[in-house]
């Protein structure tokens, strides 16, 4: 995965306690994404900071976590993350997605 301050894309991921699925989703995105990403926002609606262990190590300095206590629900979690986005484009995914080939953002 390529991170760039010049990128016009932010990755937003919503999650709720399914850390095994989230880890797989992020690993597959890391393996196949070909578009530079400015930053990553992950909303975790379970209130569990264990979410921070799910990201690939090289994402750490580019990732912001929103761990909701109390729970906000999916739509408010999305609104929270989007309120911090500074890029014109958002690539949004959920904790149970799988990426299997390059070009997913470019083709979106």
Model-derived features with residue positions:
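A conserved acidic beta->alpha catalytic loop
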Residues: 42-53
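Short, acidic, metal-binding catalytic loop of nucleotide-sugar glycosyltransferases
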Residues: 27-37
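Short beta-strand-to-loop acidic/aromatic patch adjacent to the donor-nucleotide binding site
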Residues: 88-98
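Acidic donor-binding/catalytic loop of UDP-sugar-dependent glycosyltransferases
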Residues: 97-107
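Conserved donor nucleotide-binding strand/loop of the catalytic core
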Residues: 59-72
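N-proximal low-complexity "stem/linker" segments adjacent to membrane-targeting elements
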Residues: 1-27
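A short, glycine-/small-residue-rich helix N-cap motif at loop->alpha-helix starts
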Residues: 69-76, 82, 100
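Active-site nucleotide-sugar/metal-binding loop of Leloir-type enzymes
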Residues: 79-89
């Amino acid at each position: 995965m390529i991170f760039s301050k010049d990128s016009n894309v932010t990755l937003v991921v919503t999650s709720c306690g399914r850390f095994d699925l989230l880890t797989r989703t992020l690993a597959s995105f890391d393996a196949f994404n070909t578009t530079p990403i400015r930053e990553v926002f992950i909303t975790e609606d379970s209130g569990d900071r264990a979410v921070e262990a799910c990201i690939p190590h090289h994402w750490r300095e580019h990732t912001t976590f929103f761990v909701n206590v109390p729970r906000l629900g999916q739509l408010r979690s999305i609104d929270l993350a989007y309120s911090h986005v500074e890029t014109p484009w958002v690539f949004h995914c959920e904790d149970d997605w799988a990426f299997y080939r390059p070009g997913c953002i470019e083709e979106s």
